[in-house]
Structure formats: structure tokens, C-alpha cells
Amino acid sequence: MNASNKVRIGNTSVTKIEGQVAFTTTSDKRLKNHITDLPLGLDFITQLRPVEYLRNNGAEKSKEWGLIAQELQQTLKTLGYKDAGIVTEDSTPEKYMTVRYNDLLAPMIKATQEQQKLIQAQAKTISTLLRRVEALEKK
């Protein structure tokens, strides 16, 4: 741990970090304030470009999946989020860009909820149209 309360495990030579249990983050309401509904949802998620790639430093040449930090940062900026904290520079001299992937979970949930509302509205429209077609066919 350094003076800015950051813990760094390894460097670009590290190929894997493993554990026996899932990583957890506190999410207790008592630790939060100024809570509002997240506006980022389907529009945000559909603007992201998921990619597969090989790491330049990867000893194992297995493909990984993710996002390009610079592209994510630009998408957030376009949507008015200049400093969302999800994309940052690390503390190395190279200042590599980092992504807090767990922060994508909330917008993905929001996107799924928005998509479900669209699906339900479309199902209702389809049902109405089918009834109208059936009524016309009976004439």
C-alpha cells in the first residue's frame, strides 16, 4: 500500500492473479450518500465496442475479452461523464489506462431493464396487431 491508499499487485509481467474466493466490494447503503438513479443504460452500453485481443506482455497466448480504455473514456466523455472514475491512469511511469470493469455492472442492469420495457411494449403492440389481423381475416 502506498501513501495514496492504493494497493498494486505485480506489474505488466504478471500473467494471472488467482484466489479461492470471489472478490467482494462493500455496497452498504450506510457508506453512500447523494444516491440517485443511474442515467447510463442501453444507449451507453450499445456505444461500447467489446473486443478480443492478445496482451503484448502475455506469456500465455490466450485471447482475452474486454474494452479499450481510451474508447470507453471517449464514450463516457461524449455522454457528459468527464470523470466517472471507471477509466483511470495507473501509477506506472507509462501511465497505462485502467478500467474498473465492475462499474459496468450497474449500466448493464439498467440497459437490461430498459430493453425489457421495450420488449414488453413490442409484445403488447404485436398482440394488438394480431387481434386486428384475426378480426380482418374473419370478415
Model-derived regions: residue spans:
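Acidic, glycine-rich loop-and-strand cores that form catalytic or ligand-binding grooves
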Residues: 41-55
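Residue-level signature of catalytic and energy-coupling elements of molecular machines
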Residues: 35, 45, 72, 112
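Small/polar residue-rich beta-strand/coil "junction" motifs that cap repeat-based extracellular fibers
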Residues: 1-40, 46
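Short acidic/polar micro-motifs at solvent-exposed secondary-structure junctions
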Residues: 55-65
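C-terminal intramolecular chaperone/auto-processing assembly modules
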Residues: 84-139
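Stable alpha-helical elements in mature extracytoplasmic
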Residues: 41-44, 68, 108
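Short aromatic/basic micro-patch
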Residues: 39, 66-67, 98
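Active-site and glycan-interaction determinants of carbohydrate-active enzymes
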Residues: 71-91
